[in-house]
């Protein structure tokens, strides 16, 4: 892309067309497990899934109930922040569970529904059952050594949801973690 940006205009168009054609062929060859109808969501889900099964081959991921309306007014960037951080956390939790219990079932389930102007997203995943609570914080603490560089994913999700007058909540039931996000389907 950088080469295309610095080339002359005549060559740039031909090179750009060739590049886009090759990119299109590459995308066609990718194995897409998930198709929600939203290109950003589909790309993110498939990328995260393929990344996860490299280290957790038997992990199950279900996004059949993750659907977005055609008139989605929430910016793709914000959907990416919400789902990207949620999936990173869920995948990491599944890895930790597998590390402690090699025969444990690992799963991530994503779903959404719309009620009026509100969109509700829920991500449920298996985990080891260990929640580290942080004083004066609404979210669990990271257990990673570098706490300055980690542990901000849920705060980023909350900030993105806040742009749409939304909210974030989480719950634990045995060894299942559930993250719930509510958003108003309107531009901020």
Model regions and ranges:
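Conserved glycine-/histidine-rich ATP-lid loop and adjacent helix of the Bergerat-fold HATPase_c
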Residues: 156-165
């Amino acid at each position: 892309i950088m080469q295309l940006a610095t080339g002359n205009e005549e060559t740039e168009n031909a090179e750009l067309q060739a590049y886009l054609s090759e990119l299109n062929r590459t995308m066609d060859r990718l194995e897409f497990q998930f198709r929600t109808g939203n290109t950003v969501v589909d790309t993110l889900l498939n990328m995260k899934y393929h990344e996860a099964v490299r280290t957790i081959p038997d992990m199950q991921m279900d996004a059949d109930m993750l659907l977005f309306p055609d008139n989605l007014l929430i910016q793709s960037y914000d959907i990416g922040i919400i789902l990207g951080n949620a999936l990173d956390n869920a995948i990491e939790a599944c890895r930790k569970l597998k590390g402690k219990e090699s025969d444990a079932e690992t799963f991530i389930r994503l779903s959404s529904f719309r009620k009026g102007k509100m969109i509700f997203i829920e991500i449920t995943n298996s985990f080891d059952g260990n929640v580290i609570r942080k004083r004066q914080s609404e979210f669990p603490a990271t257990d990673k050594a570098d706490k300055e560089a980690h542990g901000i994913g849920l705060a980023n999700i909350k900030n993105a949801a806040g742009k749409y007058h939304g909210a974030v909540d989480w719950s634990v039931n045995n060894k299942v973690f559930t993250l719930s996000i509510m958003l108003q389907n309107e531009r901020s």
